[in-house]
């Protein structure tokens, strides 16, 4: 008898067998109730008796087919952390849990399919080795970016590094609070300036967070709010003599809608701005265009520190006389790309007197923040992880999607020892393989191509019982596209000959990164106990 006493039902119709059309119908009903892909409540496929199908049970193998890291931590903890106490987990004794990439150093002892290449000699490391003090400040939506990603994948603060995490609002849609926690972030940045930190790295999350919503008015209000707080920070920084770099990690907010009037809710390939302010030499600077990797060498130059050989980025102000060792503020306006100067750009539409004044009075450059410039595939929109990692590393760091794509193209994905072992163990044990993956073809968090590849591997190995647990994106996909994508996937499963889609839920539920474990519990309970909205053939 297996866990929970649930017996898999024998079904004959392909639509029931594969599950995609059934879940798609349930999602359409939830759309009518106002739910969206991003925040979709957990859905569970059930048999004719209302019993959940394909739950994760002891002895099974699980592959978490998402990449990147910070959003996958909470759900992974619930499955593998023996000290987990945020809610009562099942208490697996014999579950093989494979992660696609290393989400956090705490998971280093788990089977990792594509282990990371550590980035050494980052901006933060050089500053720390010089005995200087540094401060990282962000609200929780972007905290991992100014710490883990900016530090090249290092979770631990360096000597002399202080990290400040401000909680983002919870329990309310972000477009209803476009200010987020910006006042508190601003206050901590200004406090750091007054405290005299040698390097301050801060993130204003609003542009990216609001850029992912469909609320045009909130996007415009967001731009105005960021502008006002930008003024406070710049005034404090220049007053204290800080060399100040204002830039972005990627584009998003600058595009409000597509040409056909549909709301634009995803990252862009646009360049991002760089304003470089030196209060000792205002406006006396030749600034060149470049890439995000040029940020770290430029900051080190102002700090009076030598740039390591590993940093291949160039100086953005190569001939500027800094006049000795300076203090530096790097302020990242998340998602604040360079867009058209018309009504499709919330930044243009909003009252932004501070931004307008800075771009008129100070040197201004364009930095490439997408595609190959940040280690992504050519033509791929930028993202916060790649942006911050490349800024901190001072060199192009190949991102997980490129490494995984290379593995898919050269065939090494299909021979990955960790993945092959998971399939073989499920087969030898006569248990099930579970694939938790993102229902997207272009998200920076993952691709449906990975579960499909694993299904082909399982089919070739003779493993028949494979279940898919899908996370709807709502960011890289068009709003309302979930049912169509599920039906397309169902057809692909039919061609492969194995696989059943047994659960689905929104990215905002399954991949929370704000410490809201009530969301994580909803995802976990659906995956393990079958708790969620039941979906059955009609």
Regions found by a protein language model. Name each.
Residues 1-538:
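Feature captures the catalytic ectodomains and active-site-proximal regions of enzymes
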């Amino acid at each position: 008898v297996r866990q929970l006493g649930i017996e898999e039902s024998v079904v004959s119709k392909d639509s029931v067998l594969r599950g995609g059309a059934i879940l798609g119908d349930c999602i359409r009903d939830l759309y009518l109730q106002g739910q969206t892909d991003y925040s979709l409540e957990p859905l569970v496929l059930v048999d004719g008796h209302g019993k959940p199908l394909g739950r994760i049970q002891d002895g099974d193998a699980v592959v978490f087919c998402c990449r990147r890291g910070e959003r996958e931590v909470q759900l992974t903890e619930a499955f593998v952390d023996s000290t987990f106490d945020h809610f009562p987990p099942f208490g697996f004794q014999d579950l093989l849990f494979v992660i696609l990439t290393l989400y956090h150093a705490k998971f280093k002892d788990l089977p990792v399919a594509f282990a990371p290449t550590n980035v050494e000699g980052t901006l933060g490391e050089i500053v720390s080795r010089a005995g200087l003090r540094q401060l990282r400040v962000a609200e929780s939506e972007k905290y991992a970016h100014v710490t883990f990603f900016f530090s090249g994948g290092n979770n631990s603060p360096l000597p002399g590094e202080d990290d400040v995490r401000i909680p983002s609002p919870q329990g309310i849609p972000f477009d209803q609070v476009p200010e987020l926690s910006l006042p508190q972030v601003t206050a901590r940045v200004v406090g750091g300036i007054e405290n005299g930190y040698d390097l301050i790295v801060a993130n204003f999350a609003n542009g990216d967070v609001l850029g992912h919503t469909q609320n045009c008015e909130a996007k415009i209000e967001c731009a105005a709010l960021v502008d006002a707080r930008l003024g406070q920070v710049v005034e404090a920084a220049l007053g204290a003599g800080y060399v100040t770099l204002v830039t972005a990690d990627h584009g998003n907010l600058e595009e409000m809608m597509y040409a056909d009037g549909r709301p634009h809710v995803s990252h862009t390939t646009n360049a991002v701005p760089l304003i470089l302010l030196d209060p000792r030499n205002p406006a006396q600077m030749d600034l060149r265009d470049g890439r995000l990797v040029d940020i770290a060498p430029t900051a080190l130059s102002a700090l009076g520190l030598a740039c390591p050989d590993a940093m291949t980025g160039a100086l953005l102000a190569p001939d500027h006389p800094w006049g000795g060792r300076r203090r530096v503020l790097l302020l990242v306006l998340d998602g604040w790309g360079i867009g058209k100067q018309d009504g499709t750009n919330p930044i243009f539409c909003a009252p932004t007197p501070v931004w307008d004044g800075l771009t008129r009075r100070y040197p201004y450059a364009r930095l490439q923040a997408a595609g190959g410039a940040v280690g992504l595939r050519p033509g791929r929109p930028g993202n916060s992880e790649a942006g911050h990692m490349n800024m901190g590393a001072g060199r192009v760091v190949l991102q997980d999607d490129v490494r995984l794509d290379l593995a898919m193209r050269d065939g090494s994905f299909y021979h990955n020892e960790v993945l092959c072992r998971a399939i073989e163990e499920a087969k030898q044990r006569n248990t099930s393989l579970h694939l938790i993956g993102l229902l997207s073809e272009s998200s920076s968090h993952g691709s449906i191509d990975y579960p499909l590849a694993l299904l082909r591997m399982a089919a070739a190995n003779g493993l028949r019982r494979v279940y898919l647990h899908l996370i709807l994106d709502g960011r890289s996909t068009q709003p309302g596209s979930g049912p169509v994508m599920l039906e397309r996937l169902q057809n692909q499963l039919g061609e492969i000959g194995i696989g059943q889609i047994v659960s689905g839920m929104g990215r905002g539920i399954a991949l929370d990164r704000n410490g809201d474990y009530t969301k994580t519990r909803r995802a976990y309970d659906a995956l393990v106990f079958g708790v969620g909205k039941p979906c059955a053939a009609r």
